[in-house]
Amino acid sequence: MRNVLRLLFLTAFVAIGSLAAVLGVDYGQQNIKAIVVSPQAPLELVLTPEAKRKEISGLSIKRLPGYGKDDPNGIERIYGSAVGSLATRFPQNTLLHLKPLLGKSLEDETTVTLYSKQHPGLEMVSTNRSTIAFLVDNVEYPLEELVAMNVQEIANRANSLLKDRDARTEDFVNKMSFTIPDFFDQHQRKALLDASSITTGIEETYLVSEGMSVAVNFVLKQRQFPPGEQQHYIVYDMGSGSIKASMFSILQPEDTTQPVTIEFEGYGYNPHLGGAKFTMDIGSLIENKFLETHPAIRTDELHANPKALAKINQAAEKAKLILSANSEASINIESLINDIDFRTSITRQEFEEFIADSLLDIVKPINDAVTKQFGGYGTNLPEINGVILAGGSSRIPIVQDQLIKLVSEEKVLRNVNADESAVNGVVMRGIKLSNSFKTKPLNVVDRSVNTYSFKLSNESELYDVFTRGSAYPNKTSILTNTTDSIPNNFTIDLFENGKLFETITVNSGAIKNSYSSDKCSSGVAYNITFDLSSDRLFSIQEVNCICQSENDIGNSKQIKNKGSRLAFTSEDVEIKRLSPSERSRLHEHIKLLDKQDKERFQFQENLNVLESNLYDARNLLMDDEVMQNGPKSQVEELSEMVKVYLDWLEDASFDTDPEDIVSRIREIGILKKKIELYMDSAKEPLNSQQFKGMLEEGHKLLQAIETHKNTVEEFLSQFETEFADTIDNVREEFKKIKQPAYVSKALSTWEETLTSFKNSISEIEKFLAKNLFGEDLREHLFEIKLQFDMYRTKLEEKLRLIKSGDESRLNEIKKLHLRNFRLQKRKEEKLKRKLEQEKSRNNNETESTVINSADDKTTIVNDKTTESNPSSEEDILHDEL
């Protein structure tokens, strides 16, 4: 499926912006999936550090040993599969499945109680905004910050992926789109947007309906629909925390060059029934069996032990997955409580009997979506073309059985990847909403599942602005009833499904004098502009005061309107959003933790490299051949180094200077390499004959360097002669030509390398002159050869770059000559044309004079005058007289 989408994307891919990438995130309660799209990575799934396709939703926060309780450097965050195992050992530090708590307060007993049961041991507190925070090791973490940490870690991996694709790329994630349930209210939506706003690098965030994400993916994958025939599908999405049934119509116009239209038609949901509920049911079965087997353990005692409950929940989750494919699951929990190991089994039949009361609830959202369609839609269940399965829990056998009973087996569509359809769809919608790239066009009609209303402070009646089923994004203006007086301030309350969530205070006092009853004889009204954004946030964009006055003109009356825009402020009711200062503080805190995590990871990685190198070095030293024939001084030095550094490793802590570790890695590596090279050279004679050969090679290389210098000098001298008319100073132009950065960097140490090479040649000459050869000097001779080989290799590489660079610069001089030569030619030709034009103009003037003279002669002859060449106008007049 993903290959099909990638093909569609590639064929339509056109970058609108640059250096940007879109990250689509399917933010689930239990798992998170992400896809990044950029010019370097069309539809690339962001894998976890363990190369898995989905990420555990949550993280663990621990305090490192050796740090004070208030030391900000002592915090370690763990993500990925390791978090699952930490939940049973450190339940009070493991923060999982946070999605249902977004935009909630501790007053929401149903949500909070259910979460506490699923995640025992965590301490929840209320913030000053009435939202939920977790207290971990006496540090308070607002829910938005925890979600942002999770998202930031994924965005960082996406950026690393782009860098791995092309090290030269400057693409980075700056836009993000999230899946979100349609039943999420204003507070929940704002909380998710706030979480995204405190991440680093994310400039724009978009919220996309989970159902619409799957529908978009389905259309792009299906590709072909009967032209002119409207089809109806239901996306049945059963995830970990909820069930959603989204009804859509899909229409391919008869003109198949026109885009497909996807329209949201109906919705049903259950916010608490999902995979997590089934996990808790299996956990209850395990708990009951344990208490029956161990009557000495009381229920209260078991429930007071967070680790025991976490182990039961973990075993229940594994059993649920096994029962999806098998009829029985074995349970094995070590040291459940009081060092008691517990073993039992759960059958699928036991599980299905236990949840029998929930069976009707499984399909109720589908019935609700059909019976509560928006507007005038009236599609019946038998007319549905198919039910598209999404969400991991839709694979549970009892769930599929209920769906088949409701709509028949052939209408249950399994050709969509239940795990990844939403993330594929949300990234495509994110691309469209952000206008980042051009893709296959789709007409998407999204509708609100809630009704949005307002109430003025002096009235009791609610006025609907956007009713259930209204398409969005949408904007509308409403003119209020006329009033005779203007208060200093008045309020507008905003409601979602009749529940107050925000109060707008309008400052009208500033215009009271301008809108008095004398000036507005017909009264004053307010024109309020409401907006339902693409994120389905309901807000007021503008409030205008309208003055209505009556002017008598004869027997008729003309109404004259004039308006002023009023300032207003907004305040969340009950649950409040993060303030700008809180956003800034949390953003900086996450940046600090990211920096510390990166440094800690690099530190630990370097420690591991050092430890590995030390053990490799020790193994080398224990080799019989090295012990007998190795370079004794270097073997002794490395042996002592290994012993000292291994002892040093025992005491290394995060306070250790990272440079010390890198320095030790380098020292071990250099010495180990020398010994290995020495052993590899065991068959080399290292005698005078070999050194004479080395000396000859060295002189040849120095001669090659000198020859190249002379060649360049000859060319420059030749150019000075040949290009004297076009280039004033050839040598100066040659020096001015810049070489590539990598060449300049490599040649910055040319003189140093050349000097070291000459010194090694001098050392060879000294040994040859004194005939210092023999087994007792073998180590020293090898060291000389090693130095010679190293500097020769470096010098040869640098000479190659010099030759290439000089050749390029000489070619540039030739090009400069040609450019200047052509420029001179153009100037000469231009001057020549100018001279020719002037000459031509002069010739024309001469010819004109001759013609005029001939005319004069004719006139004179006709007048019978003898003067053939009058010298002045005065003479001509005189003759005429």
From Swiss-Prot:
One GO BP annotation of this record: response to unfolded protein
Effect in UniProt of substituting residue 239 to D: In allele LHS1-1; constitutive ATPase activity
Region described as Disordered: spans on this chain: 833-881
Localisation: Endoplasmic reticulum lumen
Glycosylation, residue list: 128, 458, 474, 481, 489, 527, 844
The keyword Chaperone appears for this protein: yes
Signal sequence coordinates: 1-20
Keywords from the named record: ATP-binding, Chaperone, Endoplasmic reticulum, Glycoprotein, Hydrolase, Nucleotide-binding, Signal
Listed PROSITE patterns: ER_TARGET, HSP70_2, HSP70_3
EC category: hydrolase
Sequence motif Prevents secretion from ER, location on chain: 878-881
Keyword Transcription regulation recorded: no
Conditions for induction: By the unfolded protein response (UPR).
Gene Ontology terms: cellular component: endoplasmic reticulum; endoplasmic reticulum chaperone complex; endoplasmic reticulum lumen
Catalysed conversion reaction: ATP + H2O = ADP + phosphate + H(+)
One Pfam match: HSP70
Described function: Chaperone required for protein translocation and folding in the endoplasmic reticulum.
Subunit text: Interacts with the heat shock protein 70 (HSP70) KAR2, and this stimulates nucleotide exchange on KAR2. KAR2 in turn acts to stimulate the ATPase activity of LHS1.
Protein name per the record: Heat shock protein 70 homolog LHS1
Species whose genome carries this gene: Saccharomyces cerevisiae (strain ATCC 204508 / S288c) (Baker's yeast)
Classification of source organism: Eukaryota, Fungi, Dikarya, Ascomycota, Saccharomycotina
